[in-house]
Amino acid sequence: MIPNLKGVRIKTRHISKNIYMLEATGDVAGNIGASVGPDGILLVDTQFAPLAKQICNALRDIGGKEIQYIVNTHSHDDHTHGNAALGENSTLIVHSQVWKQIKNDPNRTLKNVETFDNRKSLYFNGERIDIVHFPNGHTVSDSIVIFNDSNVVHVGDLLNSGCLCFPFVDIALGGSIEGLVNNVESILSTIPRDAKIIPGHYEITNIDGLQMTYGMLLETIGIVKRKIAQGKNIERIKFEGFPGKYDSWGSGYTGASQWIENIYNGSLSSISE
């Protein structure tokens, strides 16, 4: 479903070398990563189709020409709905599971599609770009995109940076609480310590921001699981909440109550399995 986009503007930030981040004001859509150079443009995620004109104008302002590739980190609309509007003549690179989820939606499909299962690499604008799959975390199929020479990593919704927003795990779409924790732990051991990280939402961050999120995941999930083991129902757990140091995390679009519900439902799901 497309949110109200009235008044939304696209902000552009130069990250490193050929890499830029395009952000929609008000956090109505996922952050776009863009490699802009002599080979053309490679986009990571595409936000919503009604924002395509603004996105194209922003790319033009930084010297961008033709969009050669679009990579989707996962299938959610706020990261894929602009595929067709932006990339009519582009090649779409997606994980095979993501392709299954979007292939019947004309807004999200392109004529030229390349799928992969575990990892895909390409050379573009003078550097190697690695697309690495992480299963059953935020959704059934998430990928990160590593711009090696630029030392920038787009991690999609496996991370919402800053102490603003708890994560969201789409259990109905194959995501899992434990999988998200495992994925974040794996990313911490995969990417360079000095890498700049483009998150799915909010501000650019670094390994310290990712580590902070990892610590939050371990502690808050542990709190809810212990209370489940004590026989407390979800309403009681929501009432008791988290320690005060996490108050600010609930100010984004995923509040503490929703995150508790996410953990609770995910924990019961894993128990029933």
Region roles according to the model:
Residues N18, S35, D45, L59, ...:
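Divalent metal-coordination and catalytic microenvironments
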Residues R9, H14, G40-I41, F48-P50, S96-E219, ...:
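Metallo-beta-lactamase
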Residues T25-G26, G37-D39, T46-P50, H74, ...:
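A mature extracytoplasmic/lumenal domain signature
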Residues I2, S189-K196, E203-E273:
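Accessory terminal helices/loops
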Residues P50-K53, N57-Y123:
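Active-site HxH/HxHxD metal-binding segment of metal-dependent hydrolases
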Residues D39-G40, K65-Q68, N89, E127-I129, ...:
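Loop/turn elements at helix/coil->beta-strand transitions in domains of secreted/extracellular proteins
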Residues R13-N57, V145-F147, N151-V155:
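Conserved beta-strand hairpin/beta-sheet module of binuclear metal-dependent hydrolase folds
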